[in-house]
Amino acid sequence: MVPEMSERQVFQASELTYLLENCSSSYDYAENESDSCCASPPCPQDISLNFDRAFLPALYGLLFLLGLLGNGAVAAVLCSQRAARTSTDTFLLHLAVADMLLVLTLPLWRVDTAVQWVFGSGLCKVAGALFNINFYAGALLLACISFDRYLSIVHATQPYRRGPPARVTLTCVVVWGLCLFFAIPDFIFLSANRDERLNAMHCRYNFPQVGRTALRGLQLVAGFLLPLLVMAYCYARILAVLLVSRGQRRQRRMRLVVVVVVAFALCWTPYHLVVLVDTLMDLGALDRNCGRESRVDVAKSVTSGLGYMHCCLNPLLYAFVGVKFRERMWMLLLRLGCPDHRGHQRHPTLSRRESSWSETPSTPR
């Protein structure tokens, strides 16, 4: 998965020459990799391209700023509290890094969408792989956080505290390794190519339809369904425990639990549904026509933008909602020399093993 405009198939000059010389019938854009001439000419992309150029550059610029600032703040707070960092905090730190690295690629895709790809094939492969690595890492780290909370609340166990401190780091290394493996197709098949219809260079995949379908299947399973199922199961069990709890603290924590799954599902479900429709059209299971293709292209742009917004929501959901994170943020600002406008002689102090996840305030000593 790379930003949607760059995922469209390249229409090479050699393909155009072959079609003009060998096809008496018209050409089916959905099957441009096949050796046969097909039933319909390539559809005009004016509507979707104009929409992309008006909508995506502004969105990518906004997400770049918000994602960098929000996740940078999370990373700064968690790094400043290394001695008090819990396993959940370590996962949150890796999640913030993944989201920051993802949004750092958005300026490149902004140029690709607004003008053309001017950075060469090497940077095309690196940017696409970096984008995908952090796309998968964000989803899988959310699943790790869910499982960690599940063990802590439902089974009252802290698996990462009983073993060596490196155990949680090893889990994160495994996650990053899997994501790097999933990004291998980007290093192989992404390149800067000239689209003769658009008369512009773009960073796009070059592989047959079966490869495109397989890659989309991997994205759907590893980047969405599997993490969502893990989160749904873990948080369903957590909710069952919290609902029978009479403590006000646990009832407050339940709100955050619900928001976590709902936000992930709302941000990414529309995109994967649209991609599923597009894939079914590619496979011939749904009829393809120019009007439907144009609507699907626009829908992919809108829903992919909604998905990328999840990178900006993570700091809000996992940190800024938490009272303890705000306390840690305030303590960091005080150490950096910011004036204290709260009028308190004493500032809240956190337990050395309290997670930034918590919604409940700590008690001043």
From Swiss-Prot:
Glycans are attached at residues 22, 32. Keywords: Angiogenesis, Cell membrane, Chemotaxis, Disulfide bond, G-protein coupled receptor, Glycoprotein, Membrane, Receptor, Sulfation, Transducer, Transmembrane, Transmembrane helix. Residues 79-88, 148-169, 245-256, 323-365 are cytoplasmic. The modification Sulfotyrosine is found at residues 27, 29. It is a multi-pass membrane protein. The chain crosses the membrane at residues 58-78, 89-109, 127-147, 170-190, 224-244, 257-277, 302-322. Residues 342-365 are annotated as: Disordered. It is found in: Cell membrane. This is C-X-C chemokine receptor type 3. The lineage of its organism: Eukaryota, Metazoa, Chordata, Craniata, Vertebrata.
